[in-house]
Amino acid sequence: MLAGLAATHPEARFRFCYRAHRYLRSWRATLPRNARRSLLAEPLGPRGADLFHGLNQRLPRIALPRSIATIHDLFVMTSEYSTPEFRARFTEQARDAASRATAIIAVSEFTRQQVIAHLGAAPGRVHVVHHGIRALPRADRPREPVILNVGAIQKRKNIARLVEAFETVNADWRLVLAGSAGYGSEEILARIARSPAGSRISVLGYISAEDLAGWYGRCSVFAFPSLDEGFGMPVLEAMAAGAPVLTSNRSALPEVAGDAALLVDPESPEELGKALRDLTKSEDLRRDLAGRGSLRAQLFTWENAVRATWDVYRQVLG
């Protein structure tokens, strides 16, 4: 999105600031002529900018004339899905950003309401800008009897209940989990190891974008029963790839999925299992959801995100 902002507004000058652990990787990307990159070394910078936009809940600890913070989610504050140390650090950063930022961008209306409720931000300062979908290579191939889940192996992603629900699905089907190990993964992997359906469950770990596109293209069902999401990008990626989607009826997921997915109570293995069985048994249901999902995904573009972000910039700059 940053390059898109610079490319669509050649009249403005942009400086993309990276903390040390991201600076070297940033050189892989080519920037528009009106943008340059620099190392963000607090407390020396950034200085001299009319507006600073921080892309997460952490603003530099220096005086900024005008600033925007993007907040993606607050589950670290509101739930026990991370270590106490990380929760304390995140909470301090989010509260600091909410108190100092001229405006806040939330990636969903759900996150906007959380920012207002938990960080005390005035409603007029918090703007919703939905993400666009990243461009993944299209993998056109025959669908297989595979249920795919994409995301970290962690408690928040509700993998243990997904495994329990999968155990009720016809034995012709496989469950494929694509994502790195996260908080609470040991318990989840132990649950998979003792599952009676364990031989039909594949844990891939982290996979490349190319491999991910391949699995989106191969799966016949995409299941994402997460307990808490500030947005839910995998839902839209699966829809864009033509996969029928099952997801949770809470957090930002209904906002993102609309009427193009089966929505279930993620804390009910029975409801989740029934939805999986319905999807695996009915090709008509899968076809209907795939068609609606493809149309839904087209609403979330980076062009829209760039326009909405620039509108917030204009408001802040007056």
Task: Report residues per predicted region.
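Carbohydrate transferase catalytic cores enriched for Leloir-type hexosyltransferases
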Residues: M1-G318
